[in-house]
Amino acid sequence: MGLIDQNQPTIDDYDRSELEPEVDVEQVVLEPEPEPEVAPPPRWWGDFPLEEYQVGRWQVGSMTLSIYRLPREWRIIYSQGNDPLDPTLDIDVPAEVEAIGIDDNVRRYMFSQTQSPVTLTPVLADRPLVVRPAIPFAIETREEITLYVSLPMWLRISVAGVQQPLYEVPSFRPSDTWFGDSTLQGELCYAARAPAQLNISELPKRPYRAIAPILIRNRDEGSLVLDRIKIPVEYLALYNSKETNQFWTQKIILEQNNGRTKLRLGWGSPQEADKTERVSAPRERARRGLDIGAFGGIFRNTRGLD
């Protein structure tokens, strides 16, 4: 018996109109599947109503914050973690009273009568932040770069009926450092474990950290070697993107010329940001064309490029 049964019908025995039409493979275009929409992180700041004997609980990165309202007292309970880029973001308002940590830091504020709501306002640090690149880099004369830096934020806690904020808690508490040529010339700063990238897409995004674009211009005759950069965050406002909940500062422009550094700030949120709203004002107002060469400088080079 042969491999082909002579009694089996062949393709010629069918009505060709009943057959599937031939398809030119080269003409088939597969539409790409749409990427799933990624919802922005929940809004962890703003006004939160709390009734008497209710607790609000926020876990923002590695920091946990609880706010407890009593008839004549507000309690702020918080603890700090060690991971500056912890992705955790969880809001529970109202939460169970049992969620309050017994070993955490506690601050108590007494009033004749407490009022709702409680307000969390993101702000930047109360001191300059010193960023140390993993590897020092040089900017050649007459060149400029834009560096994107991720900055930690503080939570300013306010309550209804009280003019002044009760307290501020950092989402991550940086270590202290001294920035200056000597103990007599310089100032106390925070040592920011802050990611910094030339390409903004490579910068890790966190809803509790702000992105600061820093334009650095070298107008000196020689190379500008950067080992540490002091970011004067006290002059910066905070902006929030309505679409992504990402925080931004205005652009920082640092120009090095004849051994001195001039600071200028952009107006409003930077070009890289989406539609934004201003969330908090600067702690201090910068003078136009502020010369900060007399304030311990901005750039430091202690290791060189070797």
Predicted features, each with a name:
Residues 2-306:
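Interface-prone segments of viral and bacterial extracellular assemblies
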